[in-house]
Amino acid sequence: MKYILVTGGVISGVGKGIIASSIGTILKSCGLRVTAIKIDPYINIDAGTFSPYEHGEVFVLNDGGEVDLDLGNYERFLDINLYKDNNITTGKIYQQVINRERRGDYLGKTVQVVPHITDAIQEWVLNQAKVPVDRDQKEPQICVIELGGTIGDIEGMPFIEAFRQFQFKAKRENFCNIHVSLVPQPSATGEQKTKPTQNSVRALRGLGLSPDLIVCRSAKPIEMAVKQKISMFCHVEPEQVIFVHDVSSTYRVPILLQEQGIIKYFKQRLSIPIEDQPSTQLFKWKRMADRYERLLKTCSIALVGKYTKLSDCYTSVFKALEHSALAINHKLNLMYIDSADLEPSMKAQDPVKYHKAWEELCKAEGILVPGGFGLRGTEGKIQAITWARERKIPFLGICLGMQLAVVEFARNILKMTDANSTEFDPNTKNPAVIDMPEHHPGDMGGTMRLGSRKTVFKTSESVVKKLYDNQDFVEERHRHRYEVNPELVQQFEEKGLKFVGQDNEGQRMEIIELEGHPYFVGVQFHPEFCSRPMKPSPPYLGFMLAASGKLNTYVQNGCKLSPRNSYSEHSDESSSDS
């Protein structure tokens, strides 16, 4: 087993997750089996109770783990399925050690950060690195470990010490450290500054770890003189300094790393028997990145949500839309609309904001309402759903988005004017959405219906079933506490809102479709978590096809994308790579 530790310096959010994912992608393209571990040095047990504004979206895994969004990057880039134990937090480590102490496992010894916490970290990494994450269920050969935060953070010190010890246990030929640092370029001088990187590397060395590769992040390509300066002052060879400047898309990052000889370096440094040139998989990434940069035709989508001030809150939704747009040769123009701005109360409070929100909604070729929690902005989401339904604009509702589509239909079609979800109005006389029987109030963490669940199609006359290649059932990831009221299902279906997908027992409604509408779909699950760059999520793909006016042709052609029936349609806008 080979271990690659990715650390960060200067500032957080410098792009360690994308760098780690890209390194994994390159090594996987060389025929190696790769897994990934993300370490978050916070005391929370998991990410499930975080505000999206604190840490971005909560990514859900097949086993129901609620984890950091970087694990979503790993899954998308590497096309693997990780587990909740691939996300290590300080809270998990301390909980494990304290439980052992309570059981008497330490035989009365004084339990300390060194050696007990550091040993627990190393043990966790060793065990989890062996867990298969590919479809063939074979043990991984490479484990990429990302340490969250920056060098010098007090929260990360136990982990740094653990890996200082770990490098000797693993042996030099099995362990290397990649340090990601920022090279700022102040506008006042226009000069790229190396001092922050020098200080960061010095701090890392002072803690017992020496970087094997220094990945320098910058806004613009770094000059050769800067590379030589970093090489000299950070005591590494020039080829050990890698540049990653801002690029048009994250798909370009693995190509950027590969072009700077990173495969040859890993082959020598970790004694890996691989070819210097990657397999066709990385060439597919290059073609995808090239095609992304050539796209001219745009499809405008309105994302009507609650957490629109920070795009990280909807990372997986954005990526799923981007994957689908790329598959049909369109550039995605995603407009984030705060749902509260669409509400009538906003018209009196801030008319400019209200009219701007509605102007953007009116320009959208498709409307998406994602998952969420809480009352704020729900009426604005319902307004957007009404707009999409009445004007036959393609609509996709995810989790809460589907539930609110049901509420909107109950109010405006079934004439239950006070219909609502019991989440927002526990005393409503017409509960269109109710809390699930197995949900018990109390602890917030881990109390939802989480993880991969089976959804069975109840009819062959379903556009979503066709998008899923006419499978009898699908398995997608869930994260919710509420469900559609099964007592109202018959009334909904009589008026044209069909529940085409249900759980195994036929009691829980999972997929809705509206008759007579180009694409009005709601899903209780989160298909964005399983979308991949080269395998877009079917509900998102159908949504983008409908928004671009290509859905009917796609369905008539047996739901197959080919150069003849998709890319060549816009040969004047984008070259075909096939």
Swiss-Prot record:
UniProt organism field: Xenopus laevis
Entry-linked PROSITE patterns: GATASE_TYPE_1
Catalytic activity: UTP + L-glutamine + ATP + H2O = CTP + L-glutamate + ADP + phosphate + 2 H(+)
EC number: 6.3.4.2
Active-site residues from the entry: 399, 526, 528
Any one annotated GO CC term: cytoplasm
HAMAP family: PyrG (MF_01227)
Gene Ontology biological-process entries: 'de novo' CTP biosynthetic process; CTP biosynthetic process; pyrimidine nucleobase biosynthetic process
Top-level taxon of origin: Eukaryota
Role noted for this protein: Catalyzes the ATP-dependent amination of UTP to CTP with either L-glutamine or ammonia as the source of nitrogen. Constitutes the rate-limiting enzyme in the synthesis of cytosine nucleotides.
Keywords, sorted A to Z: ATP-binding, Glutamine amidotransferase, Ligase, Nucleotide-binding, Pyrimidine biosynthesis
Entries under Gene3D superfamilies matching the protein: 3.40.50.880, P-loop containing nucleotide triphosphate hydrolases
Domain called Glutamine amidotransferase type-1: residue spans: 300-553
Sequence similarity: Belongs to the CTP synthase family.
GO molecular function: ATP binding; CTP synthase activity; identical protein binding
Protein name (record): CTP synthase 2
Metabolic or biological pathway: Pyrimidine metabolism; CTP biosynthesis via de novo pathway; CTP from UDP: step 2/2
